């Protein structure tokens, strides 16, 4: 497989992505984290903005979480950003600011698993390490005819063995990028372009017309749905009250809106924690799909004069100026609700 892939990569592979122009371990690492569950076209502007602010691991290690989350806002999966900051701090503390030398040391950093660690070392240092991201799992499952869901331990072990066997002993960085590109651009999840595939001659899935069956999908489960009422407290000066979320869990460490289980609880919260509150009104619901559940957000807009003394902790509660926004991490749905509040205040 490797010779055909490398020949294809020379003419059809992606070679001018921002992190490829200067593939240092730090730049490749940041790109690999951003690319998890996210398309390349979406990542490029985020990566470039991130590099302008944090050109190296030391500048990232000294950053405040709010600024990192601000630059990540809109990418989703915010645990990636928190782990990236923690890992940068670990690189400086444990390795003197130099990216670790071994696969095991890289895997010991927060948020970096085996495949990501292997990709960083392969792409930045041309070291021989097999990778197994989602694209590679799909390519190998189809080419070798591997049955079963790739997330099952036995299937994953089989795929790791195949990934190791296919990885060549030279031109590692090119091969690694080539097999990822093949999965992303040719051997896609739906409607793979088999006629354009450089390794289609030996593909079990193509020979048996099994492209739609391989790899096997995740076993279906009932998708949970959650609902919450979010208090959108507005005061003069185009200010909206934000609450910092707990460090872990949904949108961990980011700034959100006070959340209540029911409208009655939200109205009670307004009476207890806002001063001079006007009668609240319910806004248009906002729905957001996470990877593992659907979230229905029901905003309760309320005008007030200020917040109660119980909310004086500025590290947890702050007034956010819609016209001059602070550089803090706002999840996209929260930013949408804050923007709605700004429009409502503009109409006054």
Question: Which residues are covered by each model-predicted region?
Answer:
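Catalytic cores of DNA base-excision repair glycosylases
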Residues: 3-212, 225, 274, 336
